[in-house]
A protein has these predicted regions:
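Charged, often Cys/His-bearing segments associated with DNA-binding zinc-finger transcription factors
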Residues: 1-35, 41
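Short amphipathic alpha-helical "interface-anchor" segments enriched in bulky aromatics
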Residues: 28-32, 36, 83, 142, ...
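Basic, low-complexity intrinsically disordered segments
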Residues: 43-125, 129-134
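Short, solvent-exposed helix-loop connector elements
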Residues: 48-50, 272-275
Length: 275
């Protein structure tokens, strides 16, 4: 029998949820009113063939991965939040007395789902939210975050040094358990080894409407055409996205460019005329 996400809690637990949720607005409360997550079960039905007789409800599991993505939580952090954060517990469908799946179960589910599976389900969530008017598309904000690969970074940095003044951002460690990761830049002086999550947020709802994961060495600006389309009224991002190609792309899509422009110093004339 599959454990259901919407558990029947005690009278006190249900009363507690009602009191908390009625006191103030919350993003997850609004999202739950416009998105029906039951479609997840059909997508994940084949995951449970060899999981034994009592697996966790796939809707609950996907919601945990979804919250991890929204709030940038590790598996252990997600387990803790699902156990003690009452808004999270309500969104997940747990009773106030019920404990969530532990971090090892969450990790296995996420691995089975995979990046492509998550993207497929995530896009369906976005479309439901858009169709219900939760997402306005008035202004899209593009940005990226760094994902650190779980590798022996000290050993990798020793190998990475000396490959040019700034190192080789295309360096591949063939013995790494995460061979698709690459060295990238947080700043001119700081590097990291891993991936980038390129995200687009709908400004009015503060909901992430598109995501793309790349190796850490991929420049932010190159990803704008894959993440912004003509549904956006305006798009903005930091100076990393300021290029003539990106401005031209947005214009062709009918999107107003609010990209922050780099400060360009007046160039010196190539030729000086002397009398």
């Amino acid at each position: 029998m599959t454990k259901k996400g919407k558990a029947n809690g005690s009278f006190f637990g249900n009363f507690l949820y009602e009191q908390i949720l009625s006191q103030r607005p919350h993003f997850l409360k609004d999202l739950a009113q416009v998105v029906d997550f039951r479609f997840v079960a059909e997508h994940c039905k084949d995951f449970y063939a060899d999981w034994g007789r009592d697996p966790w409800d796939p809707v609950l599991m996907f919601k945990m991965v979804f919250l991890q993505f929204l709030y940038d939580l590790s598996d252990r952090e997600m387990e803790e939040q699902a156990a003690f954060n009452l808004v999270y517990k309500w969104f997940l469908g747990l009773s106030t007395e019920e404990l969530p799946p532990d971090h090892t179960v969450l990790c296995r589910f996420r691995q089975r789902l995979g990046p492509e599976g998550f993207e497929t389900l995530f896009n369906q969530v976005v479309e439901q939210a858009r169709n219900r008017g939760f997402i306005t598309d008035r202004l899209h904000i593009i940005d990226s975050t760094h994902i650190i690969a779980r590798v022996d970074l000290f050993r990798l940095k020793k190998k990475h040094k000396g490959k040019g003044d700034d190192g080789d951002d295309h360096y591949v460690d063939r013995h790494s358990p995460d061979p698709d990761a690459r060295f990238g830049r947080k700043s001119k002086k700081k590097s990291f080894y891993g991936y980038k999550d390129h995200k687009v947020e709908d400004a009015d709802s503060e909901f992430i409407v598109k995501v793309k994961t790349t190796p850490g060495n991929v420049p932010d600006g190159t990803q704008l055409p894959f993440l912004i389309d003509g549904r956006a009224g305006e798009a903005t991002g930091d100076k990393a996205y300021d290029s003539e190609g990106n401005h031209a792309y947005l214009a062709a899509e009918g999107v107003t460019s609010g990209i922050i422009r780099r400060q360009r110093r007046p160039g010196r004339p190539r030729h000086s005329l002397r009398e």
